[in-house]
């Protein structure tokens, strides 16, 4: 490719709405152009990166035995209604009507469609296993799209779906896909972690995220440096507290705490460690009738250590609670506690509530909580003596750095990550809902065992940039760079030898199958170098008249701060070595 024939559009400054480095650099390098909120044109330079990502993903999926297909972007609502996701997915699912008033959705994933395909065609266990995948445009109506391709509304995703005869075979398929994902991300040259995760709206009971490590990542990744344990914050656990609860050593006392409505303020006032305080969080669940009217409300009180935060995913799995819980209203809090938030506690309630105690609080003694009276707290609270032993104890908190790892092999650490892939074992969640069965060896109908596996094709380049950039621009890994080599001749219009040497090297690299671009735009050297450093092509060759007269050209890797001299006659062989050709 010659630069004069290509579409190169770089910017000196990033748009004002570009918040993170990848968004700024993708806009400045001309990889993407914004069309609307969370919707972007993939410009030629950016599309080359995306196509390389797709090619690697496609190669490894095919190698793993998956079969490519393509499913419609617009899907009938009836299929989504069969699984209940038409209502359950909420406003993120874009719903549309055709001219006849029929409901459709714009796909965010395709579990329903692929399950419908399989229930029509799979009749016998002899046809299994099967793994179908597509690389396709998706749409999710994000409330607040941001960070460019990191959290857009329209995006490209690789989604795969495995179908097996039983759980054992399904988990083999799951591991096969997880291994394929490791090969994919290894080929991209990215630093990543595979972490245990919650299945969320997809469903299922076995799930892992593949997280690219980056300081700007939206997700907190929890891991143990001295073991293999890793999970995202939603899923992460600490080792359960061990040993007997300490004996009570303080008397129960009502203590003035004027204007101190947080655990941190109370601890500072009383001169005690924050971890000896207990925070009270009040939730509510509503029972509704068929008309959607609330017929009964249950109020819940959650107790957590003052230095810990509630984990909503874990709370949603507490017996009796589910993901539909909400925070109680001020009126509901006053009705049950007779007090404003900030001074709440489990003692002296006006009305009974259901109590959920974090397992750390369950082993505490002499703790401090609200007195259910403004400007007062209770000190010296103890189980059994002041409160009945808790009936419902659960892990409902986020872990913190320094917690003991649940495998007992060290302490937990936390870093930030960008989710670029996710694998789920679904079981029969979708096949059962859609009655997708096959005849087993015993001749009886059985539900298909499923897994699903996603990779964010358009998110991956953004994640790669977050991990690979400097003050000059992007530093692409070779595998997904828009071009692998750029040749920069200096004023070739004035020096025929420079043009001839550049053309010769260009032809040699093309003949060797190298993705090379020759910058023949006639730009000044400074502007030319600035463009390619911004765009991030990994290997740059500069050919100038003075160097040729001395018998050399200059080579610079994008990560290097200075160029090195290479014998002009050996330039092609030198690059073959660098590119491992």
From Swiss-Prot:
Q: Biological process GO annotation list?
A: prolyl-tRNA aminoacylation
Q: Which reaction does it catalyse?
A: tRNA(Pro) + L-proline + ATP = L-prolyl-tRNA(Pro) + AMP + diphosphate
Does the record's keyword annotation contain Ion transport? Answer: no
What Gene3D superfamilies does the record tag this protein with?
A: Anticodon-binding domain (3.40.50.800), Bira Bifunctional Protein, Domain 2 (3.30.930.10), YbaK/aminoacyl-tRNA synthetase-associated domain (3.90.960.10)
Instruction: Kindly list the GO molecular function terms attached to this UniProt entry.
Output: aminoacyl-tRNA deacylase activity; ATP binding; proline-tRNA ligase activity
Signal sequence segment: none
Report the enzyme's class at the first EC level. Answer: ligase
Cellular compartments per GO CC:
cytosol
Q: Which SUPFAM superfamilies match?
A: Class II aaRS ABD-related, Class II aaRS and biotin synthetases, YbaK/ProRS associated domain
Keyword annotations for this protein, in alphabetical order, are: Aminoacyl-tRNA synthetase, ATP-binding, Cytoplasm, Ligase, Nucleotide-binding, Protein biosynthesis
Localization per Swiss-Prot or TrEMBL: Cytoplasm
Stated EC number for the protein is 6.1.1.15
* Domain comment as written in the entry: Consists of three domains: the N-terminal catalytic domain, the editing domain and the C-terminal anticodon-binding domain.
- What does the sequence similarity comment in the record state about its family? Belongs to the class-II aminoacyl-tRNA synthetase family. ProS type 1 subfamily.
Quote the subunit structure annotation.
Homodimer.
What the protein does comes down to:
Catalyzes the attachment of proline to tRNA(Pro) in a two-step reaction: proline is first activated by ATP to form Pro-AMP and then transferred to the acceptor end of tRNA(Pro). As ProRS can inadvertently accommodate and process non-cognate amino acids such as alanine and cysteine, to avoid such errors it has two additional distinct editing activities against alanine. One activity is designated as 'pretransfer' editing and involves the tRNA(Pro)-independent hydrolysis of activated Ala-AMP.
Name recorded for this polypeptide = Proline--tRNA ligase
Organism, as annotated: Polaromonas naphthalenivorans (strain CJ2)
